[in-house]
């Protein structure tokens, strides 16, 4: 089982969300650490796994620019903003984990923190399960592959890649013809897969 240490960085004016996350019950296999500053501090942004930034009474574009430039690729950025600040966030939406509109009632704060916590744990559980699966199938010398109903390879093992002389990045998300360097997918292969799916065997 994994252990996950989460470093939270809280920046901007102190608010109810900051108070609530500090007393959020810690889930099994997780630990929490908090850093906090009124104005953005690059060193704290760089260390953070999760950033909650209260943009009220701050220069939105400047603050967002500092946060997005300094944060790690995997760090999640949740911004707290007033409704009238939404138009200033438009250019950055794809880089934000979420936007929480202020003011929020205590019940909504609790709901949002709980939902974030569940989603975060789910991502770590998925990472662990994926790691277990990869370790298992890569230990097996036989060719192993998982395909969707359209014949697209979703996951393959190392032996498969070695046989087709392609990387996983090249193979996953592609069909039979590309992987095996043939002009078109084998009709017999497509038919046999269709029969298996219909019979569910």
Per-range role (PLM):
Residues 31-34, 143-201:
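PAS/LOV-family and closely related PAS-like sensory domains
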Residues 2, 16-20, 128-151, 162:
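PAS/LOV and related PAS-like sensory modules
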Residues 2-123, 127:
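N-terminal membrane insertion elements
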Residues 47, 73, 95, 139-140, ...:
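Structured helix-beta-strand junction loops
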């Amino acid at each position: 089982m994994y252990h996950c240490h989460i470093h939270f960085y809280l920046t901007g004016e102190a608010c109810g969300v900051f108070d609530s996350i500090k007393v959020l019950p810690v889930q099994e296999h997780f630990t929490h650490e908090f850093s906090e500053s009124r104005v953005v501090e690059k060193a704290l942004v760089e260390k953070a796994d999760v950033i909650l930034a209260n943009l009220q009474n701050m220069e939105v574009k400047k603050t967002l620019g500092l946060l997005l430039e300094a944060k790690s690729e995997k760090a999640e950025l949740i911004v707290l903003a007033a409704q009238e600040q939404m138009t200033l966030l438009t250019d950055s939406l794809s880089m934000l984990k979420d936007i929480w509109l202020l003011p929020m009632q205590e019940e909504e704060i609790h709901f949002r923190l709980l939902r974030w916590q569940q989603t975060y744990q789910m991502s770590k559980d998925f990472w662990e399960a994926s790691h277990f699966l990869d370790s298992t199938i890569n230990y097996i010398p036989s060719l192993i592959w998982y395909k969707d109903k359209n014949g697209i390879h979703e996951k393959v093992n190392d032996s498969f890649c070695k046989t087709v002389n392609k990387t996983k990045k090249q193979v996953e998300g592609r069909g039979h013809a590309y992987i095996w360097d043939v002009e078109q997918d084998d009709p017999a292969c497509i038919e046999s897969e269709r029969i298996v799916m219909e019979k569910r065997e």
